[in-house]
Amino acid sequence: MKFYLVGGAVRDMLLGITPKDKDWVVVGATEDEMLANGFIKIAANFPVFIHPQTKQEYALARSEKKTASGYHGFEVNFSKYITLEDDLKRRDLTINSIAIDQNNKVIDPFNGQADLQNRILRHTSIAFIEDPLRVVRLARFKAQLSNFNFSIAQEMLALIKELVKTGELNHLTRERLHIEFVKALNNPKIFFTTLKELEALKIIFPNISCFLPLIPNKSFFENPIYKGSNINEKITLCLLKIPQQQLDDIRKEFLLTNKHYKLLKASIAISKILEDRSITAEEIFQLIKNANIIRDKNLFAESLNLYKKYLKICDTITPHRNYQLLQTTINTIKNASIDSLTIKTIPKDKLRNTLKQLKL
């Protein structure tokens, strides 16, 4: 059996990036032989193994044949007679179809190194269009590698636009799209605009297609403050200007977790309260209550700090109200034990006056 380093790790190394993970392909081996050599199988129906010492992933070389719609519709062959080139040929892009053998020799049957040097994203074979997920992965790679300014090969653009017309993208699951979105958080604006260029955005993320101008520009995501944020924060910073009434649709579209949703909802409420000149005292009260930032002090602190972070990155927005007064207002509402009542039923006491001050 022979072992080859493959895929993203090789691509990143050739670009001068330290790879986060290393994946290996094994040629000339069977599942039983892998187990006999101490490898640990990690998938019941798929011959992928963990190395007993390095804990890195090793997969048997395979070929694929399209048999049905969607990205699950493939017949996979793991025969020990599958060659390295067979395995590399099934991969999506030439830059991901490069291998390094145990003697550190680069094996590049599809000229991926030339495409790396020329910053071109190109399909390895016509089989690219057999898997609709690869359209989303292409946009994600463009976002992930945004520092290198890759462009998409013209012949590939034409190929993808034909694929979009077939309806294959409708078979993608929200779970898989969520994973790709999170991986694209390096620069989601590039991710979305690339999908739009591929005529796929309206199909995959129809709500974002309507609100694409509200996603910050590319330079926003290149800011060190954004880059140093965690995933929850990046999702909120990306979607902060989406209208409050669209949040439930956005939540379904991206399959956001409860934590993502609560932080996003609270941050959008704070943004609207502090920036909107025309908002009424009643609307302020409802936003504060509905965002659950009265009861949850940690949520309020986290979302307010995140909004401040957004302002630092933008460096062009000046809130019309101050943070301290917002905190005072929330404390006043909490102490008044208001729940189902609206502000219109509240006498002109400290609560109403504080809300009116905040409105001003």
Swiss-Prot record:
Gene3D superfamilies: Beta Polymerase, domain 2, cca-adding enzyme, domain 2. It catalyses: a tRNA precursor + 2 CTP + ATP = a tRNA with a 3' CCA end + 3 diphosphate; a tRNA with a 3' CCA end + 2 CTP + ATP = a tRNA with a 3' CCACCA end + 3 diphosphate. Mg(2+) binds at D21, D23. InterPro entries: CCA_bact, NT_sf, PolA_pol_head_dom, PolyA_RNA-bd, tRNA_CCA-adding_enzyme. CTP binds at G8, R11, R91, R137, R140. CDD domains: NT_ClassII-CCAase. Its cofactor is Mg(2+). GO terms for biological process: RNA repair; tRNA 3'-terminal CCA addition. GO terms for molecular function: ATP binding; CCA tRNA nucleotidyltransferase activity; magnesium ion binding; tRNA binding. Its EC number is 2.7.7.72. Belongs to the tRNA nucleotidyltransferase/poly(A) polymerase family. Bacterial CCA-adding enzyme type 2 subfamily. Catalyzes the addition and repair of the essential 3'-terminal CCA sequence in tRNAs without using a nucleic acid template. Adds these three nucleotides in the order of C, C, and A to the tRNA nucleotide-73, using CTP and ATP as substrates and producing inorganic pyrophosphate. tRNA 3'-terminal CCA addition is required both for tRNA processing and repair. Also involved in tRNA surveillance by mediating tandem CCA addition to generate a CCACCA at the 3' terminus of unstable tRNAs. While stable tRNAs receive only 3'-terminal CCA, unstable tRNAs are marked with CCACCA and rapidly degraded. HAMAP family: CCA_bact_type2 (MF_01262). NCBIfam families: PRK13296.1 (NF009811). A single active site specifically recognizes both ATP and CTP and is responsible for their addition. This is CCA-adding enzyme. It comes from Francisella tularensis subsp. tularensis (strain SCHU S4 / Schu 4).
